[in-house]
Amino acid sequence: MIKTLSQALRMDKERFKVPKSVQQAIPIQRIWPDGIFQQGTKFSKTYRFTDINYYIASKDNKTEMFLDYSELLNSLDSGISAKITINNRRINKEEFEKSILLPMKEDGLDHYREEYNEVLLSKITGTNNSIYQERYLTVSVHKRSIDDARTYFARIGTDIVTHLAKLSSTAEGLDAESRLQIFRDFFKGDVPQAFPFDLKQFAKKGTSFKDWMCPDSMEFERDHFKIGDRYGRVLYMQDYASYVKDDMISELCDFSRNLILSIDILPVPTDEAVREIQNRLLGVETNVTNWQRRQNANNNFSAIVPYDMELQRKETKEMLDDLTTRDQRMMFGILTMVHLADSKKQLDSDTELLLSIARKHLCQMATLKWQQVDGLNTVLPYGLRKINALRTLTTESTAVLIPFHTQEILQPGGIYYGQNAVSKNLLVADRKKLMNGNSFRLGVSGSGKSFSAKEEIVHLALATDDDILILDPESEFTKLVEALGGQVVKVSATSDNHLNAMDMDAAYGNEKNPLIEKSEFILSVFEQLVGAGNLSAKEKSILDRCAADVYRDYIRSGYTGEVPTLKDMYRQLMLQPEEEARGLALSSELFINGSLNTFAQPTNVNKKNRIMDYDIRELGEQLMPLGMLVTLDSIFNRVIQNWKEGKTTWIFADEFYLLFRYEYSANFFYRLYKRIRKYNGFVTGLTQNVEELLKSDTARLMLANSEFLILLNQASTDREELAALLNISENQLSYITNVAVGSGLIRCSGNIVPFENTFPKNTDLYKLMTTKPGES
């Protein structure tokens, strides 16, 4: 027997004591706050890591992930035990629903909240949304003291985090409470905590930490066990196929039940492994030589070596070649899994289903007979291995049991954006938790991008007190905003709604002196009126002087009374002695006293409404530059005021590519995009014209730096551009190619997840959000 294996078996061997209580049945002797557990001389530490998009990756990407995962396995030290665990944990249904459903507010909008909640509940029913999958890597090592163990885990923990980061998986070491929570969830299910976990209080009172996590009762039978009122069974992989597909583990775990699957790995030093295989090869060659000698003695000189001997020789040589030339390591492994059910009948049915999945992959799973206790202690991430039905594996054959499937997005307190196209789980993201929560929604006309944005607006309007500002070039949001009690501002030369370009109060801008920023804005206004870039230094000085004169009385009155307008600015220019002043007045006359004077009137709309829709559809080409300037100034100052009051602001800009036709609006949004996170705000850009948007280097930079993107159905030319810019694989591109309305890819924090999103047509919310003719 290999020295490493015999040593591990000897050190893990311990006397069996009949447990006299449920607490004694839990094989943890001692714990430390940093998450290290002790059992005899063995110390263990658990690391939680996130899933990655293995299922939808291209063949080349899968190969790369496989090699990176193999590298992680090769990095495991000899003499340790590693346990990779997938935990299908059932979420408390009431808590889950409470976290995503909208509470009623009795503000006249509860009808919409009820509809929205019904839609969410329909998405939960019949899916795995009550099951949350977590992944752990538990490392166990024999050490003399906790200090030695802590030093070791500090080193190996860094290696584990680094190797998993190469796979785009985030890993973290679990502290004592997080680690014990795994066992509590398994043993107690949905039973609420009677008291919070506090290690110091346990020590102070002289009680055991096991009281917090252990079940009321545990009964072990020949081939199953019972925890409280629930039934469970431990299975193990008895026989493996010659070739195992890499999706077997994900298929076994794609099951709407509480289950835990663990793969125990015992790495062997390469020198020991090579020596062992050489000895085995020598034994095989000796058997072949002895067989040939017997045949020769019988004058049978042409006899062919028996197939079984030839196969042994071939497989042993291949194994030796793997170890010596292909950087493979020998490992001993065992796969175990435990599943729970509410009844014995359901348990037997689930067991048969799991066994059939294994048979489909030409593997043989079996129930542990009279070893359910040892099996349970092996499969749970204690860091122990009580079942010794070990199989000799190489790095490659171990890596085939890859624990990755598809990424999920489930951030507490977030917004529902659809369902994972692979797992059908809800995708709930919280943009406030991202480093840069700005977003783009990209898709061809009719792909569902404005509907998706409206869904987000509905959630924000019904669930939060945040302010929502919409730049609406196509009048698409008018009906929804009015239904939600918002203010629609029609910005045009003929509209009865007016926005005063000279609006200013004490909170204007982000400086101590609002006049400084307002004067700078007035210069920008007159640049648009006279012609971009045509203001001379003398004209700028005249405008600055006039602005100070116009605002003097208003500022002295404490920003009360009538706010000056561009007409006051015109009169002040006419009073100046310089010829240039009259030239400025004449150049701007069309927009102040002429037919396009809508921004020279006092503001007559409620700019304090929390939902504002700036409808600029009828803003003509002549008025568009000035209209964009005034509208964007109004939006930005609302953001600043909200920031000072501690409020969050969400800005939605439809047909985003239009903004990049004008230098001022393009520069404004670029600056806003970079700065708005500082002011507790978030920008969302929507566009169908991706190709035109990507012609702007500024827009490309904004798109590449966005942490949250929703990509819907794309035109072929746009797909290629986006794939290159956002590093989207060919397989992932298939999810934005000729797909159903509302389906596509979500990119969140660098993770790309395919999604689908449908909304019932027989609801009032759908009629408010749809833009399809005949449905609204």
Labelled PLM ranges:
Residues 52, 59-78, 85, 89, ...:
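P-loop NTPase motor domains
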Residues 459-469:
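Post-Walker A helix-loop "phosphate-sensing" segment adjacent to the P-loop in P-loop NTPases
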Residues 452:
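Hydrophobic positions on the alpha1 helix immediately C-terminal to the Walker A/P-loop
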Residues 441:
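Hydrophobic anchor at the beta1->P-loop junction of P-loop NTPases
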Residues 468-471, 650-652, 676, 682-688, ...:
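Structural recognition of the conserved hydrophobic beta-strand(s) that form the central parallel beta-sheet
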Residues 449:
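Conserved lysine of the Walker
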Residues 1-404:
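Extended, folded cores of ATP/NTP-driven motor/assembly subunits in large transport
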Residues 485-489, 698-711:
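A short helix-turn-beta junction within AAA+ P-loop NTPase domains corresponding to the substrate/partner-engaging
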